[in-house]
């Protein structure tokens, strides 16, 4: 994972004026123009930036960003709204009739993953009785939480508000993803469990978190060309 300073630099470079952030899908793009739905996480922005700025040769294909949180992207993918999208691996079985999973750009947690945090020292056993703030039921973070802790009470909170909500005391525990995994030590919260480490120790395997998908109705040739661009 990249350091915090690097992430802040990317956030300055990829300003939000370059992104389409409306949660309502736009009208269908022109021929050979494709929308890429991805999260505001800097590594996603970095991954797709070259495709949207002409930094690499994409032939006749052009791309535009659609900047949304991962749970919203999962929901849009259920409807097949965007031609290309980042999605949670947990949600992929639900959309596999509409999308191909690309063989590039996946997020695999090897020695890291979503983190369970609290605003005070709490044991893992005591945390099971509390209400968790989670980034969405379609996220791989929620699946990992369920695998590690079984049935727990939860409420869905935008991923970038989970840590502030825990700090405010709105929730005693939360599951953080994206930049929160890098900054939690500086935010004064307590780490209860790193779900990526838990999964690695349990299985010896990386934890599948996110992937990129391309819509099947574009045709196999176009899907392969877009995947090559990515």
Regions found by a protein language model. Name each.
Residues 159-230:
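Pocket-lining segment of extracytoplasmic ligand-binding domains
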Residues 101-124, 199-217:
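Hydrophobic/proline-rich hinge and linker segments of small-molecule sensing/allosteric domains
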Residues 77, 86, 156, 174-176:
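A structural signal for short, well-ordered beta-strand segments and their strand-loop junctions
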Residues 99-103, 152-154, 189-192:
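Active-site regions of enzymes building and remodeling cell-envelope glycoconjugates
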Residues 94-96, 145, 183-186:
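Short loop/helix-cap segments at secondary-structure boundaries that form the rim of catalytic
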Residues 1, 13-20, 24-107, 118, ...:
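N-terminal hydrophobic or amphipathic helices and topogenic motifs
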Residues 31-53, 112-172, 179:
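Bilobed "Venus flytrap"/periplasmic-binding protein-like clamshell domains
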